[in-house]
Regions:
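Repetitive helical segments and hydrophobic/amphipathic motifs
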Residues: 11-12
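Bacterial N-terminal signal peptides that target proteins for export
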Residues: 1-8
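Sequence context surrounding c-type heme c attachment/ligation sites in exported
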Residues: 23, 27-129
């Protein structure tokens, strides 16, 4: 019985790894990166409002949101796959693919800035950010 459970688990893992290696569908890639950018916006909006005084300052919430943005900022690049740039459902311009190195540098700069912001926000002090 134990041997059968191990074999079933192994077969399941092998099947999952085969699916993970399959080429992603461009539509799925578009949905993936749009979802991430929506989550980034969801967190940045209140942060901006706190900085502008439109919302009361909440250092704990700001810090949490900054950490979310730092984590999320590392995720979108993998969603920019060939065939996902000129779709009607995407605002990603074909120029991104043509100028990949420049785009990659800018995304890396965003990741670095988000990490710096998250670190500064840990204090909860508005003046630190």
């Amino acid at each position: 019985m134990k041997k059968m459970a191990v074999l079933s688990l192994t077969a399941g893992l092998l099947s999952a790894s085969t699916l993970a290696l399959a080429t992603p569908d461009p539509e799925d890639a578009i949905d993936y990166r749009q979802g991430i950018f929506t989550a980034i916006y969801w967190n940045f909006g209140p942060m901006g409002d706190m900085m502008k005084g439109k919302l009361d300052w909440d250092g704990k919430d700001f810090s949490r949101r900054a950490a979310n943005v730092a984590t999320l900022s590392t995720m979108p690049l993998e969603g920019f796959i060939p065939g996902s740039y000129s779709d009607d459902d995407s605002d990603a311009l074909p120029a991104i693919e043509k100028n990949w190195d420049d785009f990659n540098e800018r995304m890396t700069a965003f990741q670095e800035s988000a990490a710096v912001l998250a670190e500064a926000a840990k204090s909860g002090d508005k003046a630190s950010v």
